[in-house]
Amino acid sequence: MIDTLKNIKVKDVMTKNVITAKRHEGVVEAFEKMLKYKISSLPVIDDENKVIGIVTTTDIGYNLIRDKYTLETTIGDVMTKDVITIHEDASILEAIKKMDISGKKEEIINQLPVVDKNNKLVGIISDGDIIRTISKII
C-alpha cells in the first residue's frame, strides 16, 4: 500500500474549488463563511493567489466565544502566517507525513493548501480526502 500512496498525486485527490479569505476580511465574516460552506479552515491569499496565512474554525470560534476579538479584528490580525503547504505533484504519502509534522496528537494538521510551481493556491487536501483515497485502495 505504501508504494500505491507514493504514486497517487495530491492534485488527483485534492479539492480544487477552494473557499479562501483575504487578510482585510473581518473574523466574524470569515467564521460565517466557514459555517456556511461547512469547512474547517480558510487559506488566506494575496492578490496574486499566493497563500499568506490560514485560519481555522477552532481558532476563530474559540476566541470569538471568549470575546477576544472586536468587530474590527481582521483575518490578517489572527491568521497563522507560517503555513505548511504541499505541491500539487507531491504524493499522498508526502501529504500524510506533512500533516503529522511532529508525531504528537495535538499537532496534526487536518488540511494542507496545495500550490503549483509558482506557489499559487490550486487546491486544498484534507485528512478526509486522504482517508477516502485509502479506503478505495484497501
Swiss-Prot record:
Domain of life the protein comes from: Archaea
Stated name of the protein: Uncharacterized protein MJ0922
Keywords: CBS domain, Repeat
High-level lineage: Archaea, Methanobacteriati, Methanobacteriota, Methanomada group, Methanococci
Record flagged with keyword Cell inner membrane: no
Chain ranges of the CBS domain: 14-70, 79-138
InterPro entries xref list: CBS_dom, CBS_dom_sf, CBS_domain-containing
CDD domains reported for this sequence: CBS_pair_Euryarchaeota
Repeat keyword on record: yes
A Pfam family hit: CBS
